[in-house]
Swiss-Prot record:
It comes from Borreliella afzelii (strain PKo) (Borrelia afzelii). The keyword Secreted applies. This is Enolase. It is an enzyme of class 4 (lyase). GO terms for molecular function: magnesium ion binding; phosphopyruvate hydratase activity. GO terms for cellular component: cell surface; extracellular region; phosphopyruvate hydratase complex. Pathway: Carbohydrate degradation; glycolysis; pyruvate from D-glyceraldehyde 3-phosphate: step 4/5. Its EC number is 4.2.1.11. NCBIfam families: eno (TIGR01060). (2R)-2-phosphoglycerate binds at Q164, K341, R370, S371, K392. GO terms for biological process: glycolytic process. Belongs to the enolase family. Its cofactor is Mg(2+). Pfam families: Enolase_C (PF00113), Enolase_N (PF03952).
Length: 433
């Protein structure tokens, strides 16, 4: 039989930020090859799986991944060679067993994930299926509503905007292709507005603009202006989604949120909740990710009680795609959505488990990229396979982001009349009071 793993190769390649990352090839007995590369994040949750870096400052500023690659070649490969590539759960469990740590610090989540994803791609190719068909079977027909990053701030840029991502969601589109067209039109319109006001139109890590705006509010106002000027209605055709990444603003000693890029103002948890409540009243915001810090569970509970019935509240640093943290959130009634980043947890099997838990609890799930990406488009197939209905994969520029959108356009075409785009109906976790 040709579906057993014959050989696993691994190499160090470069991501979209110019940092090394891991790429793996899983080769089956019949010569079928699956290849996958892993991403990395700029703002990382304290509880997420460990990305193994070499730490040798004289090589790639300490960011080399040769240790992770050696772990694939010397520890993972000898154990997986001969196993069936068609049994993803067994492959992933074997790697978790070999690592034996809660955060995958022994082998590195970057080593484990590269092999996990490459195995799925090899298995799909062996069976003559697309990756989304293999992972999602007959249910894989929902195209996601995209969260398109158009203004960057915080750790993703060098400006005076505190919040990391300002995004648009084309909730009024009828198809995924139309959603991308609408987003592109707003992106280019925004570029023209920024240019006209004398702002720079250079882009950040994820392809959004990073102008030196005067305030956080100005970012929202610029986006609303761009939506209208492009011919769309804010809140109806296109809504705003935010990722303020407030863990980056939180001081655990003082338990205050410091708006360090703009006013230097210090806010208590209660004041931060009020801040977001006012923004939701003022702007057409449909989703806020990491509106409170990952350590501030009480603040998260207050935020959820205050506005969780109005908008989607996404836990990223809070949950780190981990079922134990998600379970705690569900029990406490904290957030109503989880961000799914495969490299935060480290295997496809655990990713599927997290999405299943979220859906059972009535939480939405959003498949996400990282700020350090590659040309790998696995998450585009994954979001269709999981049927989460939402994807966050950057702006409408930079090939590392566009590659995922283009793959989804191809998938929509392949699905023909069975393709579904749910638009504003993806927000089933918003419990109206």
């Amino acid at each position: 039989m040709g579906f057993h793993i014959y050989e696993i190769k691994a190499r160090q390649i470069i991501d979209s930020r110019g940092n090394p990352t891991v790429e793996a090839d899983v080769i089956l007995e019949d010569g079928t090859c699956g290849r996958s590369a892993v991403p990395s994040g700029a703002s990382t949750g304290i509880n997420e799986a460990v990305e193994l870096r070499d730490g040798d400052k004289s090589v790639y500023m300490g960011k080399g991944v040769l240790k992770a690659i050696e772990n694939i070649k010397n520890i993972i490969a000898p154990e997986l060679e001969g196993m069936s590539a068609l049994n993803q759960v067994a492959i992933d469990r074997k790697m978790l067993e070999l690592d034996g740590t809660p955060t995958k610090e022994k082998l590195g989540a970057n080593a484990i994930l590269a092999v996990s994803m490459a195995t799925a791609k090899a298995a799909a190719k062996y069976l003559g299926l697309k990756v989304y068909q293999y992972l999602g079977a007959y249910k894989a027909n929902i195209l996601p509503t995209p969260m398109c990053n158009i203004i960057n701030g915080g750790a993703h840029s060098d400006n005076s905007v505190d919040f990391q991502e300002f995004m648009i969601m084309p909730i009024g589109a009828k198809t995924f292709s139309e959603a991308i067209r609408m987003s592109v039109e707003v992106f280019h319109t925004l570029k023209g507005i920024l240019h006209g006001k004398g702002y720079a139109t250079s882009v950040g890590d994820e392809g959004g603009f990073a102008p030196n705006l005067k305030s956080n509010e100005e970012a929202c106002e610029m986006i609303i202006e761009a939506i209208k000027k492009a011919g769309y209605e804010p809140g109806k055709d296109i809504a705003i989604a935010l990722d303020p990444a407030t863990s980056e603003l939180y001081d655990p000693k003082t338990k205050k949120y410091v708006l360090k890029w703009s006013t230097k103002e210090e806010l208590t948890s209660e004041q931060m909740v009020e801040y977001w409540s006012k923004w939701v009243e003022k702007y057409p915001i449909i989703s806020i990710e990491d509106g409170m810090a990952e350590e501030d569970w009480d603040g998260w509970k207050k935020l959820t009680d205050k506005i969780g019935h109005k908008i989607q509240l996404v836990g990223d640093d809070l949950f780190v795609t981990n079922t134990s943290f998600l379970k705690k959130g569900i029990e406490m009634g904290v957030a109503n959505s989880i961000l799914i980043k495969v490299n935060q947890i480290g295997t496809l099997t655990e990713t599927f488990e997290a999405v299943e838990m979220a859906k059972k609890a009535g939480y939405t799930a959003i498949v996400s990229h990282r700020s350090g990406e590659t040309e790998d488009t696995t998450i585009a197939d994954l979001v269709v396979a999981l049927g989460t209905g939402q994807i966050k994969t950057g702006s409408l520029s930079r090939t590392d982001r566009i590659a995922k959108y283009n793959q989804l356009i191809r998938i929509e075409e392949e699905l023909e009349t069975t393709a579904e785009y749910h638009g504003k109906n993806v927000f089933y976790s918003i419990k109206q009071k």
